[in-house]
Amino acid sequence: MVIILLLVFFVGSSVSQPCHPNDLSALRELAGALKNKSVTESWLNGSRCCEWDGVFCEGSDVSGRVTKLVLPEKGLEGVISKSLGELTELRVLDLSRNQLKGEVPAEISKLEQLQVLDLSHNLLSGSVLGVVSGLKLIQSLNISSNSLSGKLSDVGVFPGLVMLNVSNNLFEGEIHPELCSSSGGIQVLDLSMNRLVGNLDGLYNCSKSIQQLHIDSNRLTGQLPDYLYSIRELEQLSLSGNYLSGELSKNLSNLSGLKSLLISENRFSDVIPDVFGNLTQLEHLDVSSNKFSGRFPPSLSQCSKLRVLDLRNNSLSGSINLNFTGFTDLCVLDLASNHFSGPLPDSLGHCPKMKILSLAKNEFRGKIPDTFKNLQSLLFLSLSNNSFVDFSETMNVLQHCRNLSTLILSKNFIGEEIPNNVTGFDNLAILALGNCGLRGQIPSWLLNCKKLEVLDLSWNHFYGTIPHWIGKMESLFYIDFSNNTLTGAIPVAITELKNLIRLNGTASQMTDSSGIPLYVKRNKSSNGLPYNQVSRFPPSIYLNNNRLNGTILPEIGRLKELHMLDLSRNNFTGTIPDSISGLDNLEVLDLSYNHLYGSIPLSFQSLTFLSRFSVAYNRLTGAIPSGGQFYSFPHSSFEGNLGLCRAIDSPCDVLMSNMLNPKGSSRRNNNGGKFGRSSIVVLTISLAIGITLLLSVILLRISRKDVDDRINDVDEETISGVSKALGPSKIVLFHSCGCKDLSVEELLKSTNNFSQANIIGCGGFGLVYKANFPDGSKAAVKRLSGDCGQMEREFQAEVEALSRAEHKNLVSLQGYCKHGNDRLLIYSFMENGSLDYWLHERVDGNMTLIWDVRLKIAQGAARGLAYLHKVCEPNVIHRDVKSSNILLDEKFEAHLADFGLARLLRPYDTHVTTDLVGTLGYIPPEYSQSLIATCRGDVYSFGVVLLELVTGRRPVEVCKGKSCRDLVSRVFQMKAEKREAELIDTTIRENVNERTVLEMLEIACKCIDHEPRRRPLIEEVVTWLEDLPMESVQQQ
């Protein structure tokens, strides 16, 4: 009702009359500051402004005054002009849902007649202190969904205020009592999605009039105050996403007008009071993700107007003794992740509007009620992780739910036979039958599910071959047949799946507004990765842990959309098809534990998004590819292949050195290499041959030593000859370089002519070599791997611009070198390598990375990034913030590396691809929709680094046993379950104040917000990190 009353101000039409000269001038100045000419072009011609789009006037026929300016959703860009303050008769100002930026001009406070102000959903920033304080007649103030900051008290107090919405901003501080005491009639108050702290006591004066109270997604603590239960006019109460605790009082029954109660994601405990008999107007109840226990409140049956009932993720137990027949409007019922038991009530099938029903992870048993046939509106059904029986009858019942698009039945019907006579399911997009132990062959009735996109049959006892008709399932793009007993070859038809060749982008009808995640599990014990809609599933084929044989089809290269391919633990033979290198989106490739032979295609170096790769335990030979991501894969990815050699180890470097030293005993070296690869067969050979092999080993070692000596003896004359052959060379040293007279030949010699032994790092832009100069100083030389794509003058200008970025927390660029076709960048040397090395590779790293050191690293890296974003001229977006680009000096001070390199290289030659910028695990979600890197994207990536410091985990873990998932998803799930403390790295947990670490975790979560506009600026992150205490708790 209050919203309707306020909208009365907007009713009216433009008056055909000239407007006041002051108003005309102010509007023209406003138009000059805006960029959407389609709206403001007409404003610049003529003087009859009362006829202009969005302008409303009142007054005399001679000169009307502008009283309403209404321009919502007009695509306006630019800033709000100070001239608005000259429209002194303005009563309504609505510029909402545009793209206005900058600060709100203080001149708005001159609009003493203003009653409605709506600047919501823009890009406004800065403080509002003193900006709107002069609006004495204001009744409706909406500045939500911007980036406004400061204390909540900065907004001011207004005696006639009816509605105040400051949600989705950056306001801080406590809720001050004056907010309501100055206005006795405030009815709508929305403070949600800010950074407010303290308790709810400051709202005591609102209790007389408030109808809608929203304070969700802040940092509030304490219990619900008693006055809250006495607001009899209250219709909507939303407190979700805070740290509120205690129990709900039985006085909740006093709120008889309540329509919506949302208190999810807090720390409430004890039982849910059974007082709903007096809350008959209730339409939406969400108490999910708390610590409630006890029984299902029976009095809920009297809330006949309920549309949404969400009790998930608590510790509720017992059977559901509730008659659902009266819930004629119930659309969403979520009881997942509790301890409910017993059979499902038949009455549950008498909810005609039910669209979403989630009963997963409980202890329900028995059969699915036959009444479920009546759920004709049902879209989403999850019954996983229970003890339901009679799969055949279940499908017979559910086939009548003709709108069903998502069906998750995992971990039920243990050991039953798969039926062959199923019909219906015409709209099914997701079918999950994993971990059921079902027996039989893959049923042909699946072909009737024309819209099926995701099919999970993993961890069952399916046998026989993969059917050829699977290629006819045009919508299918996610297949998991892993952990069965399937046999035969992979059918060519699987490479004809249209949605894996080219994703059509038509996601199913699955509702993502419910907030109910689907969890994709890759093994029996993992919690899985959440995907809230079908389009978020990664296109995948999992056929691992079966008995499949034959060769890997070269036609698999057709599946350009494929992200995950796991064929491990089968009986495949033959070679690895080179066509796989054409799968540009591939993130996971696992071919381990098969019988493959031949070599790893060198073209695999082009798979720049590959984060997990394994060919372990096959019969492969030859060199392991040495470019791209391959330096980052662990030894375990290649073990069990005695014929493989790695380019940075022997014998591959020996083969290379023989090319440089043709006079060396290459024949002995090659023979030795063959011996090393075939030595396993000596187990049954005679003693005489064994002695011969032993002598060969001795010769091999002598040969390798001889070659190594030759490499170390490469002289200046040889390097000079190579330089001349490559063409003209040039070296430019900046003032920061300590070696002023360095020549190109000396630079090459300092790296042993880019010897493998001098490699100290590998990134998306190329290898990094350690340079040892004659005077004892060191440098890091980056050999850019991409085509620079620029004229020499442009390249030099870009590099010199980067050299001017000088800050103590940046790796300083000391010079560059052009040598033939190579571009070399000379950086200061960091003694302690990268943060990634200390966190994830060095065995004793955690002994050094105590909490104080981690915090110092986070602070330093944040300061370096803030310099790039705000101080450096021109401003620099890093595009690839990650732990391996944070280098550490001898004092473990952080230095940000690789900034600005994306501008030096052609995008198709580096990690900065035409599809995404950055490195897997650090890439912001919005980059999948846009090719434009932003400062907010850098903040997301930095937030992932903070998660690494808190948890000690990689952003995308190499699978270990049965726990494989990405870090961001894990953090959000643990946070939702209020288990944040379990995320803290166990190596620091005992020696640090837990609250301090959790504060850093909270900062990280702000940085990785899915919505870019809600992420903080990096300078805000710097401030928050510097406020964290350094002292670690000493061990007792």
Curated annotation (Swiss-Prot):
Query: What does gene deletion cause?
Result: No visible phenotype.
May I have one GO cellular component term?
plasma membrane
- Point out residues bearing the modification Phosphothreonine: 751
- List, in alphabetical order, the Gene Ontology terms for molecular function in this entry: ATP binding; peptide receptor activity; protein serine kinase activity; protein serine/threonine kinase activity
Its record classes its membrane topology as:
Single-pass membrane protein
Catalytic positions?
Answer: 880 (proton acceptor)
The ranges of the LRR repeats are 89-111, 113-136, 137-159, 160-182, 185-207, 209-231, 233-256, 257-279, 281-303, 305-326, 329-351, 353-375, 377-398, 403-423, 427-450, 451-473, 475-498, 561-583, 585-606, 995-1020
Q: Where is the signal peptide?
A: 1-16
Catalytic activity reported:
L-seryl-[protein] + ATP = O-phospho-L-seryl-[protein] + ADP + H(+); L-threonyl-[protein] + ATP = O-phospho-L-threonyl-[protein] + ADP + H(+)
Where is it mostly found?
A: membrane
- Output the InterPro entries linked to this UniProt entry: Kinase-like_dom_sf, Leu-rich_rpt, Leu-rich_rpt_typical-subtyp, LRR_dom_sf, LRR_N_plant-typ, Plant_LRR-RLKs, Prot_kinase_dom, Protein_kinase_ATP_BS
- Compartments in which it is found: Cell membrane
Task: Kindly list the cysteine pairs connected by disulfide bridges.
Answer: none
At what positions is Phosphotyrosine found? 827, 867, 922
Glycosylated residues, per the record, are 36, 45, 142, 165, 205, 251, 254, 278, 313, 323, 385, 403, 421, 483, 504, 523, 549, 571
Name the Enzyme Commission number(s) assigned to this protein: 2.7.11.1
Give every Protein kinase domain span: 754-1025
- One Pfam family recorded for the sequence: LRR_8
Keywords in alphabetical order, please: ATP-binding, Cell membrane, Glycoprotein, Kinase, Leucine-rich repeat, Membrane, Nucleotide-binding, Phosphoprotein, Receptor, Repeat, Serine/threonine-protein kinase, Signal, Transferase, Transmembrane, Transmembrane helix
Q: Where does ATP bind?
A: 760-768, 782
Q: What does this protein do?
A: Phytosulfokine receptor with a serine/threonine-protein kinase activity.
What PANTHER family has UniProt attached to this entry?
Answer: LRR RECEPTOR-LIKE SERINE/THREONINE-PROTEIN KINASE-RELATED (PTHR48056), NON-SPECIFIC SERINE_THREONINE PROTEIN KINASE (PTHR48056:SF18)
Q: Which family does it belong to?
A: Belongs to the protein kinase superfamily. Ser/Thr protein kinase family.
Q: What is this protein called?
A: Phytosulfokine receptor 2
- From what organism does this protein derive? Arabidopsis thaliana
